[in-house]
């Protein structure tokens, strides 16, 4: 299918009415989705396709880049066919993606040189420790990128590929290899190799991007031994990224919005101003607070990152971020490895079936501890087991562990920013769990707001694309589309809250290999 020529900006009113929908491609850690949004910002239809996880060694996590593509393009094609969409029904495409996950491919053949190294993978821990043994190097990385040196980010993953895949470094030095986070890989494929680009939010997660000057940093590229020719062009989140040109796909749909999943969720929650915050309960757990044009420095192990901006916004907008590595992945572990549940939906009923955890705490440090601890060598543990501990206690402890980790982030973020969060917007798959959100409100002593449409990550990507084309006029129009579905406020006594928090901190302390 083909569509008539259309520009990505400055559309006349008649052109604005040509496309009835915006499609968001939401490429996540465990599945790929295509979501169709109408002008009211409502998800009209969606298709989701899971793909396999690969665990070659303990602490290592990989994806086959072809699985990412087949699941994402398959979801897009199925959505178009199932909804009977003609090419001109679609105004534009927005892309949001799992961040940091690293793919290196041959520019000539389009073939990856190896599996993607996933954001959760810890194989480069020793490399990071060796490179950053000099405190001045670690300080410079943080000052330039806003990030704390960690295997989580892309830089060390690229170096590992160049150092360990036969012929990769030589090919890279000849200019034959391209690096990209998942957004770049999708854009390259959708445009049939015509566009090698990323957006500022994904670039800011590589540990190679100067977030203050808006460019790839030569010192960091040299530190990690990465040829500059591998790097994608960096564009604003709302801008033109080419159009679909891959044979077998709908031709000529503009790709006009790209953002990493957490920045997309911040945008989808309409957190456009300093002090507005959201938490996404996905595979990981991610708390972001918009800090406006100020790149706020953290003394609590949080990172400074770039926020997605609407078209026409002058200057760079920033966010303060804290991340938890295991959130939905912890629930997946309960199902797949322990066999305690058949589906995530069961966790709410089981958690409510007991009055408390019976003193059980789970510290889900399966791939290390994220902010505010940043202990890559910590490992998961369950504390407080007795003969009376049952399945429900362990499931409840897992859900409570998610909430405790978010609490740690909120406390650190408030201290770093000087802003007290009275309200936290929430989204992501696990936000459908009422028990989790009520316990979160209880343990934080804060109000939580959950929108009726919890697919705010995909919505953020759609908003960025639609604002770029004129499908939506401006931020004010988008704000009016926002909705609040449910509000959760604390019901827990202060004494009980502090007892539970003290127990959590004791459990975390027993898993840590790095002491404060």
Go through each PLM region and give its residues.
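N-terminal glycine/serine-rich phosphate-binding loop of ATP-dependent small-molecule kinases
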Residues: 3-114, 143, 233, 249-257, ...
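Short secondary-structure junction motifs
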Residues: 31, 87-90, 229, 357, ...
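Residues that line or immediately flank small-molecule/substrate-binding pockets and catalytic motifs
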Residues: 51, 97, 120, 238, ...
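Short, conserved phosphate/pyrophosphate- and ester-handling motifs at nucleotide-, phospho-/glycolipid
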Residues: 64, 121, 261
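Short beta-strand-loop/turn "lid" adjacent to the catalytic site in phosphate-handling enzymes
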Residues: 81-119, 145-154, 187-210, 235, ...
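A structural motif corresponding to the C-terminal end of an alpha-helix
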Residues: 223-230
């Amino acid at each position: 299918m083909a569509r008539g020529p259309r520009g990505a900006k400055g559309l006349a009113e008649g052109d604005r009415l040509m496309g009835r929908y915006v499609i968001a491609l939401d490429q996540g850690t465990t599945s790929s989705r295509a979501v169709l949004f109408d002008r009211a910002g409502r998800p009209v239809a969606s298709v989701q396709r899971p793909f396999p996880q690969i665990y070659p060694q303990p602490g290592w996590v990989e994806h086959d880049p072809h699985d990412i593509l087949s699941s994402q393009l398959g979801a897009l094609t199925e959505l178009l066919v199932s909804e009977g969409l003609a090419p001109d029904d679609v105004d534009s495409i927005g892309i949001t993606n799992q961040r940091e996950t690293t793919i290196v491919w041959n520019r000539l053949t389009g073939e990856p040189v190896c599996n993607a190294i996933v954001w959760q993978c810890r194989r480069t821990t020793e490399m990071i420790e060796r490179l950053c043994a000099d405190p001045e190097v670690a300080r410079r990385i943080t000052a330039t990128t806003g990030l704390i040196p960690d295997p989580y980010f892309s830089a060390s993953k690229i170096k590992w590929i160049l150092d360990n895949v036969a012929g990769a470094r030589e090919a890279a030095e000849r200019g034959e290899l391209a690096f990209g986070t998942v957004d770049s890989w999708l854009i390259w494929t959708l445009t049939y190799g015509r566009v090698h680009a990323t957006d500022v939010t994904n670039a800011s997660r590589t540990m190679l991007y100067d977030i203050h000057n808006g460019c790839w940093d030569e010192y960091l590229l040299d530190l990690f031994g990465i040829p500059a020719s591998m790097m994608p062009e960096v564009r604003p989140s709302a801008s033109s990224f080419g159009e679909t040109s891959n044979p077998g796909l709908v031709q000529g749909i503009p790709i006009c919005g790209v953002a990493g999943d957490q920045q997309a969720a911040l945008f989808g929650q309409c957190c456009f101003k300093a002090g507005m915050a959201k938490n996404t309960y996905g595979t990981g757990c991610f708390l972001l607070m918009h800090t406006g044009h100020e790149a706020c420095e953290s003394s609590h192990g949080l990172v400074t990152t770039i926020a997605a901006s609407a078209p026409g916004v002058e200057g760079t907008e920033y966010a303060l971020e804290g991340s938890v590595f295991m959130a939905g992945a912890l629930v997946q572990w309960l199902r797949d490895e322990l066999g305690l549940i058949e589906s995530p939906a069961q966790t709410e009923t089981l958690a409510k079936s007991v009055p408390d955890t019976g003193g059980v705490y789970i510290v889900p440090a399966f791939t290390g501890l994220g902010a505010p601890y940043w202990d890559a060598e910590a490992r998961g543990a369950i504390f407080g087991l007795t003969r009376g501990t049952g399945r429900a206690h362990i499931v409840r402890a897992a859900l409570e562990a998610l909430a405790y980790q978010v609490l740690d982030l909120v406390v650190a973020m408030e201290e770093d920013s000087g802003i007290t969060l009275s309200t936290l917007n929430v989204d992501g798959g696990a936000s459908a769990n009422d028990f989790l959100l009520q316990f979160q409100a209880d343990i934080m002593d804060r109000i939580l707001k959950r929108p009726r449409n919890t697919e705010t990550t995909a919505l953020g990507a759609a908003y960025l694309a639609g604002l770029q084309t004129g499908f939506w006029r401006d931020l004010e129009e988008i704000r009016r589309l926002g909705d609040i579905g449910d509000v959760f406020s604390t019901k827990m006594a202060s004494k009980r809250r502090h007892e539970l928090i003290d127990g959590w901190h004791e459990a975390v302390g027993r898993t840590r290999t790095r002491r404060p």
